[in-house]
């Protein structure tokens, strides 16, 4: 009887304790248990800035972060809280199903269950990587690349983890999953990449909270900014003097000891930089981290490395400072466009010289028609020597209108985006057999190689290499634009931004990204017309130019 009474007493106490929890931070401290490198019950001691994030009352929250600042654990705790306390279905989105969602399930979710007796009790089915059940409540884990995976899962809580690495055009589909719920809580977190894209685009619409704390020396409220609060020692990343770099209070100039951060940051608060914004935003750099890997000496070595190559430059600003950054020359600028405006107006028809056309396919068919000026003596890469004159750039609704453009401008060769209207694009290519190819951006193609399929209707190219060439013309001033060029064209060619990364072998690689709401159709039409040039030359420019039957 005593054992039964004790059990009932324990359950009543547990129930009362459970009902007293009204904040995610309380839930985390009560029920979350962590593994290495900080094993034991959840604590805010090493990451005090996370408490305010946990307990945000906003419906829409944005976290623009440096790497390894605890934001993922925060949104995971918030997810568990709403599943456990409110019984709300949640959708947790990662960049890709494989390996991201699979790794998240194995490395984050499953250990959280194994280490917490409370979570073991509430989750009844955890075997499915993409679907975890807690009684009648569901946690869906999805990759952003699969549209089907983001459909038919109505949820009240949505988490986008590493938004900048996601397929941006599928994000609105994930948001639509909340339309049927009375409670709609959203968290978007990510290390940023470039301005006005991904997480930064949303963060700029938020309160942009900064973490302030009391200086242990002068007691004034301060925040940490680079380079204002950093004393930089040494001259390069291998200089041992760099280890002497340290953080200071910019008000009293006293040193802030790295080992003491966990104490003087403890009672800090988030202070909004902007008021009357629709979203609650949190931004923080690694200068706040008390981790050994974030010691000021190591931080400054990363800063010195950033001066040596664009990949480390990008990495320092994004992962260390938690700030977006555009490396010089990474995007087309207004000044470059202005410098390329010629004396001509757009043509209505044209019948002289070598002419190509590129078409990007979407709701509209965006096209660019180019006349090429080729010197008498050229090398094997004709694009390097040729100068381009844009004689018309615009958009139309139907492929039949492209037929008229082919005829009126005597287009020698055209390259058309093969998706999403592959059937219509193929029919167009068949009508102009030998003078039109469908283009696919593919893998396994290096440099400016063009892989032509056996049917010779499809070509596969490396996206980054060709965009480097086609958009690089604006910087090199090897392209002439009409004076009546549309603002839409200018906006589209400015949309792609080249970001720099290192692959698994440490080699420098680049790729182009754009904002969720940005359009780059004319940029790709420009690219396809560039690809059409060597195809036109290889097939001969003296072919019969009559329109198809």
List where the protein language model places each region.
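Charge-patterned, long linear interaction tracts outside catalytic cores
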Residues: 477-548
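Compositionally biased, low-complexity linear motifs
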Residues: 70, 85-86, 373-379, 537-539
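C-terminal/domain-terminus segments
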Residues: 303-308, 394, 439-441, 541-549
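Mg2+-dependent endonuclease catalytic cores in nucleic-acid-processing enzymes, primarily RNase H-like
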Residues: 61, 103-104, 237-240, 244-255, ...
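Hydrophobic alpha-helix feature that most strongly marks membrane-spanning transmembrane helices
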Residues: 84, 179-182, 407, 475, ...
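Phosphate/NTP-binding elements of NTP-utilizing enzymes
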Residues: 1-355, 359, 407-419, 430-432
């Amino acid at each position: 009887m005593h054992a039964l009474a004790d059990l009932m007493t324990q359950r009543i106490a547990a129930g009362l304790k459970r009902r007293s929890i009204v904040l995610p931070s309380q839930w985390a401290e009560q029920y979350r248990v962590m593994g290495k490198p900080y094993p034991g019950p959840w604590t805010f001691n090493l990451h005090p800035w996370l408490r305010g994030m946990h307990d945000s009352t906003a419906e829409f929250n944005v976290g623009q972060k440096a790497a390894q600042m605890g934001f993922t654990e925060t949104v995971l705790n918030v997810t568990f809280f709403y599943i456990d306390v409110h019984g709300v279905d949640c959708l947790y989105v990662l960049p890709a199903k494989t390996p991201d969602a699979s790794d998240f399930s194995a490395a984050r979710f499953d250990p959280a269950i194994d280490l917490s007796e409370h979570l073991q009790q509430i989750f009844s089915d955890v075997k499915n990587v993409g679907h975890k059940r807690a009684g009648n409540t569901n946690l869906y884990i999805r990759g952003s690349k699969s549209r089907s995976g983001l459909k038919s899962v109505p949820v009240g809580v949505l988490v986008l983890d590493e938004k900048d690495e996601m397929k941006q055009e599928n994000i609105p589909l994930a948001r639509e999953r909340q339309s049927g719920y009375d409670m709609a809580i959203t968290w978007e977190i990510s290390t940023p990449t470039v301005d006005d894209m991904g997480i930064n685009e949303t963060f700029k619409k938020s309160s942009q909270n900064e973490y302030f704390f009391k200086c242990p020396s002068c007691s004034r409220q301060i925040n940490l900014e680079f380079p204002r609060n950093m004393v930089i020692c040494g001259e390069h990343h291998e200089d041992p003097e760099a280890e002497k770099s340290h953080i200071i209070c910019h008000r009293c100039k006293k040193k802030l000891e790295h080992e003491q951060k966990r104490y003087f940051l403890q009672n800090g608060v988030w202070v909004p930089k902007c008021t009357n914004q629709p979203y609650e935003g949190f931004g923080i750099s690694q200068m706040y981290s008390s981790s050994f890997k974030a010691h000021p000496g190591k931080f400054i070595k990363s800063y010195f490395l950033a001066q040596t190559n664009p990949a480390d430059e990008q990495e320092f600003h994004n992962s260390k400072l938690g700030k977006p950054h555009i490396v010089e020359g990474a995007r087309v600028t207004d000044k470059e466009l202005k410098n390329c405006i010629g004396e001509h107006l757009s043509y209505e028809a044209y019948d002289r010289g070598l002419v190509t056309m590129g078409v990007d396919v979407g709701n509209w068919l965006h096209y660019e028609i180019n006349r090429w000026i080729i010197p008498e003596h050229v090398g094997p890469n004709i694009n390097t020597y040729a100068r381009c004159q844009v004689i018309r750039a615009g958009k139309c609704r139907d492929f039949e209108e492209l037929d008229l453009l082919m005829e009126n401008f005597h287009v020698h060769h055209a390259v058309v985006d093969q998706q999403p209207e592959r059937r219509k694009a193929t029919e167009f290519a068949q009508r102009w057999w030998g003078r039109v190819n469908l283009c696919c951006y593919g893998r396994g193609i290096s440099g400016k190689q063009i892989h032509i399929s056996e049917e010779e209707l499809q070509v596969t190219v490396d996206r980054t290499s060709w965009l480097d060439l086609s958009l690089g013309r604006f910087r090199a001033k090897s392209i002439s634009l009409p004076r009546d060029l549309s603002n839409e064209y200018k906006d589209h060619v400015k949309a792609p931004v080249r970001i720099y990364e290192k692959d698994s072998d440490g080699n420098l690689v680049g790729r182009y990204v754009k904002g969720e709401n940005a359009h780059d159709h004319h940029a790709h039409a420009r690219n396809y017309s560039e690809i059409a040039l060597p195809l036109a030359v290889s097939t001969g420019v003296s072919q019969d130019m009559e329109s198809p039957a």
